[in-house]
Amino acid sequence: MVNSCCGSVCSHQGCGRDLCQETCCRPSCCETTCCRTTYCRPSCCVSSCCRPQCCQSVCCQPTCCRPRCCISSCCRPSCCVSSCCKPQCCQSMCCQPTCCRPRCCISSCCRPSCCVSSCCRPQCCQSVCCQPTCCHPSCSISSCCRPSCCESSCCRPCCCLRPVCGRVSCHTTCYRPTCVISSCPRPLCCASSCC
């Protein structure tokens, strides 16, 4: 029987296709002949068996998300962990708050769901990602200065460089003492906290 061959004897003799059963998926049996798309089962998703050909929906789980399994066919939300957060995994299906790490913050991954403190990079400061939850000092650049980003941590002089008040950076929600500079002292900016 197959079950009786799934021990040390099986690992020494070699793992053939007939031995690649769910009960026989051991680290010692995860060779090229056993780790195939037809035999990639959840019980085979171990560190030694995490091969590119095993990165299917049934095997792409948090316990199987290793760097060598992070390929385009394995980029799924369940694989969005720190060890699998690669640039090629930053797609719409993998760009979630649990996957927003600094090394995943590329231009193709700048989405509202990725706007967290660790992903707030200049290349993510677009209209779709510039939200109050993403307004951090590291995002205080000219391309990210928008009314929704005017918080205490984002209201810096570099955000108050628009010539016309009431537009973009010089908005009523952004009038704070740190924003009062020579290029932005308009009557509209004279709020109680900004006078």
From Swiss-Prot:
Sequence repeats lie at residues 5-9, 24-28, 29-33, 34-38, 44-48, 49-53, 54-58, 59-63, 64-68, 69-73, 74-78, 79-83, 84-88, 89-93, 94-98, 99-103, 104-108, 109-113, 114-118, 119-123, 124-128, 129-133, 134-138, 144-148, 149-153, 154-158, 159-163. It comes from the Eukaryota. Coiled coil: none annotated. One of its GO terms (cellular component) is keratin filament. InterPro entries: KAP. It holds the Pfam family Keratin_B2_2. Residues 5-163 are annotated as: 27 X 5 AA repeats of C-C-[GIKRQVHEL]-[SPTR]-[STVQRMC]. Expressed in the hair follicles. PANTHER family: KERATIN ASSOCIATED PROTEIN, KERATIN-ASSOCIATED PROTEIN 4-11-RELATED. Interacts with hair keratins. Belongs to the KRTAP type 4 family. In the hair cortex, hair keratin intermediate filaments are embedded in an interfilamentous matrix, consisting of hair keratin-associated proteins (KRTAP), which are essential for the formation of a rigid and resistant hair shaft through their extensive disulfide bond cross-linking with abundant cysteine residues of hair keratins. The matrix proteins include the high-sulfur and high-glycine-tyrosine keratins. This is Keratin-associated protein 4-11. The gene is KRTAP4-11.
